[in-house]
Amino acid sequence: MISKCYADAVDDQFQQICSGSTLPSQSVRQLVESGFVVIPGPVSGDLFDELTTAYNEVMAVAAGPDFTIASTTTRVSDLLTYASVFDDVYLYPPLLEACNHIIREPFKLSSFLARTLRGGTPAQELHADLARGSEDAPLLGFILMIDSFRVENGATRFVPTSHNWTDLPCDRLSDARAKYSGEVLGCGERGTMIIFNGAIWHGHTANVTPDSRRSIQGYFVRRSARSGFDFRNRLLPAARSRISPLARYLLALDDETQ
């Protein structure tokens, strides 16, 4: 049983997020109607340089089960363990307000990871991050561009309004890697953020350059939904000691279940 005091605190945090107005109405409209939006990110200048340096350091030292080298990407899933500069990403007010518009009830951070797309890699298959009718829906995803996202280096493509469709790419397409009519690339300069409905059809395009393309990615879900990463039991004491009450709420550190 969650105590009334804790429940009141959670509700208060959610109400404060709901009262925000930092995400422009046109961005809200595009997110709701098209399924994704590209906006300025949370950090710039020297702080962004600090974030980039921290990202590179993490990728250089990460090891163990939270460090994954896949066919086209290299990922670190316990990113929040390493540096406080990463906190600014998931605490970004426009991002939290976007969560309110899509999830529409108290929510939590489900995953937060570093993801490097290596050079010379093929396009990813179009996909949605949740099966249609999933009990964990809705899901709000975000991508912070550590490097610029361009046509040639694997920018993420989205199929506008596909978050409203009842089928998935695998139900309709014989080649989910092929270009899809009407797809739109989420391009931007370093520091730009993409926010998207997890139900939208999307996937990175081919990185035909020799250079890697770096990003920070994550997802928010309802507080009662399953989490992709168990922050409550996995976040180290040093990281716990630095975070704010809002961060504790978003990481669900005081919830009884994840």
Label each residue range with its predicted role.
Residues 120-187, 225-234:
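Catalytic core of non-heme Fe(II) oxygenases with the double-stranded beta-helix
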Residues 35-36, 191:
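Catalytic palm active-site di-aspartate
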Residues 38-39, 142, 194-196:
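Short hydrophobic-aromatic micro-motifs
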